[in-house]
A protein has these predicted regions:
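N-terminal soluble segments of membrane proteins
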Residues: 1-5
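Short, intrinsically disordered, charge-balanced linker/junction segments flanking boundaries
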Residues: 145-150
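Core catalytic region of metal-dependent phosphoesterases/phosphodiesterases
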Residues: 9-21, 26, 31-144
Length: 150
């Protein structure tokens, strides 16, 4: 349920039994940056999958600072495979393919200021596209979360 920037996720456990559930929270992955530690990221996701954990991606999954209209643009920090004219399209496609096997564990992907900057300057919502792709491809029910600051 989305109310403004607040995302509520309700879990209905009908059995009435005590249930232990692992939760995995990650933020600021900056997946398309050369500084993203992908080995650690995927190792953590493998552990989450093994434990049947709910995964919450809390903002800035994408670095997304190398677009044409971003004043912070520095191509040297963009992973080489994304240095192409369809950068935003390709990074969504590539990352979604790499996340497919974890889709049923991912409960929510929320945008951060990096995704919102791309939405403002390039009129595309990277995190929403990622969620849509994963849900359509895998049948998962990932929620696209909100963004807010207090």
């Amino acid at each position: 349920m989305q109310t403004g920037a607040v995302t509520s996720i309700l879990f209905d456990f009908e059995s009435g039994e005590l249930l232990e559930k692992w939760l995995y929270f990650t933020s600021d992955t900056h997946f398309d940056s050369v500084y993203c530690n992908r080995n650690m990221f995927f190792s953590d996701l493998d552990q989450a999958k093994l434990r049947d954990a709910f995964v919450f991606v809390i903002g800035d999954f994408f670095d997304a600072m190398q677009g044409r209209f971003d004043p912070r643009r520095d191509m040297s920090i963009l992973r080489p495979e994304y240095r192409r004219s369809d950068y935003y399209d390709y990074v969504v496609k590539d990352s979604s393919e790499k996340l497919e096997k974890y889709a049923n564990n991912i409960a929510m992907i929320a945008p951060g200021n990096h995704e919102l900057s791309v939405l403002k300057n390039a009129n595309t919502f990277l995190s929403d596209r990622l969620v849509s792709y994963l849900n359509n491809k895998t049948g998962s029910r990932i929620i696209h979360g909100g963004y807010g600051g207090w």
